[in-house]
UniProtKB/Swiss-Prot annotation:
Signal peptide: none annotated. It comes from Drosophila melanogaster. A zinc finger (RanBP2-type) spans 735-766. GO terms for cellular component: cytoplasm. Has an essential role during oogenesis and embryogenesis, perhaps in modulating the levels of nuclear import of additional proteins. Modulates the nuclear import of dorsal (dl), Dif and male specific lethal 1 (msl-1). Negatively regulates nuclear import of dl and controls the accumulation of dl in the nucleus after immune challenge. Homomultimer. Binds to dl and msl-1 via their nuclear localization signal (NLS). Also binds to Ran, Ran-like and mbo. Keywords: Cytoplasm, Developmental protein, Metal-binding, Protein transport, Transport, Zinc, Zinc-finger. It is found in: Cytoplasm. This is Protein tamozhennic. The gene is tamo. It holds the Pfam family SPATA2_PUB-like. GO terms for biological process: protein transport; regulation of protein import into nucleus.
Amino acid sequence: MSDFVPHDLIPDLWDEILRRHWMFLETEESIEKLEERKQLEGCLKEFLCVVQHDRKFFLPETGHVLRRSVLELPDFSAQNAIVAFETISQYANNLFTKPWRKEYRTLKTYSGCFQHDIQSRLLDAEQLFLAMGYRRAAEDTFVLEGPICPDQVTNVSRDAMAAYVECQIMKHIYAGVTAAGYVCTWKDILQFRERYVGGTSTTIKEMVRQLSEKRVRMEQPPMQENTYSNVVSAAPTACGMRSNNVAHHPSSSGTCALHPNGLNEAGKYLPPYPAPPPQQPHLPGPLMTHSRSLDHYQEPQAHLPHRHSFDQQLQQQCQLPHVYEAPYDCLDGLSMGSSASYAAVTGAYNAPGNRYPLPYNISSQLNAPYASPADFYGNGQHTNMYATLGKTGPAHSCDLHRRQPNTSAAAAAALAAMQHRQSTYPPDHHLIDFDERAHLTQHDFGTHDYDPQYAELRGQVQPSMRGNPVAMYATYGGYDLPTTLPQAPPPTGQDMYIYARPVPKSSRMRALAEAGGINSTDKHPRSAEKQSTMDNNRKMHKELKERNSRTAPAKRSGTERDIPTTISDLNSYDSASLDGFVALDSSSSPPLMPKVQEGVGSFESWNYVFKNLERSGYTKDLGDREDLLVQSLDLGSLSITNGGAAPPAEKRREATNPTNGEKARTLDKKSGTGRREAKVVQAPAPSPLPNSSSAGVKKVKSALKTAVVDNRGTGSRQRTGAVPKQPPNVSPQLIVTSPNEWSCSFCTFLNPDTKRICEMCCRSKDFNLEAASAASSSAAAAAASAASVSHASSTCV
C-alpha cells in the first residue's frame, strides 16, 4: 500500500523499529511489555527526527488523517490526537493478538469509545480501519470478514504509534515556543515540520528565530513610497506666512502652498510638491493631491493671470521647459515623476481657449488622499473618500492655521460630503444610475396641481377643495376615498440609495421613454433635469403600481358594468363579466393603506361586493343589520324558488312563513352569545312550471352552484336606481354539504352518503334533536316531530 522503502534510507534504524515492534506485540501484559514500548517509542522518535515528512509513515492514510485533523478540526490539540492514535493502535494490537474474538470483527461507529476517543479527535479515522481489512457494511458499521492479514494489521499498529510519537514531538515544540514568549498554532508547527527536518530542540530554536524576525518587521514603520513621484517629502517645521527666517521644505517652493511669502532662493525653481502634515512624519505624502486652481474654475480670467501649474505660486515666473505642447491638464499635479509640469503652457491656466474644458463639476470629485472635504492634505482621523466644495476655502498645508476637528464635526463633514457628491450630477443621470425604490414624500400627492392630466378634473372640484390634495382625492371619481393619506417620513441622506441596484443604460432610457420623460432616441438625456421635481408618481416603482391596480377603484366605462363576486365560476349564469374593467393608471389615484389590500377595510374596496348584493335582491329594509366585520353566510336570506320573478319582499315573506308541506328548523344559536341567528329554509323539490323553458332550468342549476356573500355594513350606500336581473337564491344545504355527504343533526359531522349511522356520535341519519326533546314531553309532540324528521331527511341527501 505504499512505495516507502525504509531500507534505502536508514536500514539499521528501520530494522530496529520492526524488531522491537514484533517483540512488543508478542510480549504478554507485564512490566516487560512497558519497557519494550518505551524502547519502541525512543526508536520512532529518533526516526521521525532524521527523515523527511513524507517518509515518516508507512501508510499514506496515516499522514492524511493527521494533516487534515490539524488543518480542519476546530478544536484540535496534540493531546487529543495522542489519545485517538493510541486507541487505534491498541485496537490493531488486540485484533492481531486475539483474532478469534468475534467482537473485534464488528466495529460500531456509534459506540462510546469510537465517538469520544476517535471520532471527535480525528478526521477520516475510518481510513485506518479500512487499511486493516475492514469494509463498511452500513453507515455506522464496519465488518471484517475472513482471516485477518497480519501485515495490514501490524502496519496500522506501527503507523498509529508513529503518529502518537509525532504528536508528542509537536506538543513539546508548542510548549517550548510558548515558554519563549511567542505565540504559534498547531498548523504552524505542522507546516514547519513538513518543510524542515530536525529534532525537538532544533525546531524550537528555528521557530523562535523566525517569529522574532517577524515581530521586528511588524514593529518597524512601513517604507515611504510615492507612486506618482520620485521625490521623497519630509515634514515641514512651520508656515512661512509671517516670517521668512523659518526653515522650508528642501524640495518645495514653500511649506504652505497658499502663502507666497515663504519662498527662498534655494527651492524657488524646484517643482512644487505638497508636504505631509508634521504630526505624521513617518507616513508618505499624499498621492492624489487636489488642484487648488480647480477651486476657482468658474472665476474670471483676471483673478488667475499666471497659474500654469496646479500647485504653483502666483509670483513664480521662471518655469522649466514643458514636455507637451497641448493644452492638457495633469489632474494629480505631480507630473508622473518628471521635473517639468505637463500643464506648463503659455498664457493663463484658466484662460478661455487655452485648455479643453473638464467634465461637469469635476472639481468637486477630486480629493486629497481620502480625507475630509475641508482637509486637502490627508488627515488620518477622517476616512471620507469624496470631496465637496467647502465654503471656507481650501485649507493650508501647514498645521499652524488648521482648526482641530472634533468627532461631531468630522461626522457632519462626512455626511455632507456624501450628500453633495450625489447632488453634483442631475438627479436622473448619475455616474451610475440605479433602479431605486423611490420614497413617497408629501409633495408627491400634490402632483395634480402641476400635472396636465389633472386639468380636466379641476372644474369638477369645489373651489374650497382646490389646493388640498386630500380633499380632492376624497371625492375623485365619485367614490368615497379615505381622507387620510400615507405620509412617508422625509428620507435622509443615508436612506436615498439603500435599495439601489445598477441597471443598464438601455433599460434606463426605455424606462424614461415609457414614463414620458424623454425620447428614447434623444442624444442629450440631461435635458430631463428641467422637468418638474414633483412628478415622482411618474417614476413610481413596480410595487406601488401593483398596489394601486389592486386596491384603487376602477375607471368606469360608459355602460357602468358591475363586477360579480361569487364563489363559483363567473360565467355560470348570465351576469356582467370583467370585460369592462379597466386597469387604473398609477398616477390617477393615491395609494391606499396596506391594510385595505388584505381585505379589511374601506367602502370603496368592497363596493363591487355591495353592487352584486343589490343585483342578488338585497335591500336596506331586510331586518336588523349585523356587524360589518362579521363576514359569513347569511343563511336566513337564501332560498330556492321556482319562478324567480317574485319581488324580494315577497321572497322574504315566503321564507319566514312556511306553508303546507314546508317546514323550517332553526339552528340553536342564542342571541345572548353575540352571534347572529341563521335560518335554513327548506323547500320542496322544484317542479317545472307549464310556461318554463329549458333555459330557465339551466339558470336554476347554475344558480345552485353560486353562493352569494352577504356583507352588510352600517354606513350609507349609493344606489344606482336600477336593479339588474338576479340569480335565484341558493339553499344552504347545497352550500354546507355536498351531494355525497350528509350532516349529522346532533354533532354536525359530515358523513358519507353510504352510511346511515354517524361516525362521530353514532346517531342515525334520521335523528332529530328537537324531535327527541319533544318526544319526552308529550306523545302528540312526538308524532309531530316524527313528521318533521321524515321531511328533513328528504332534503339532507
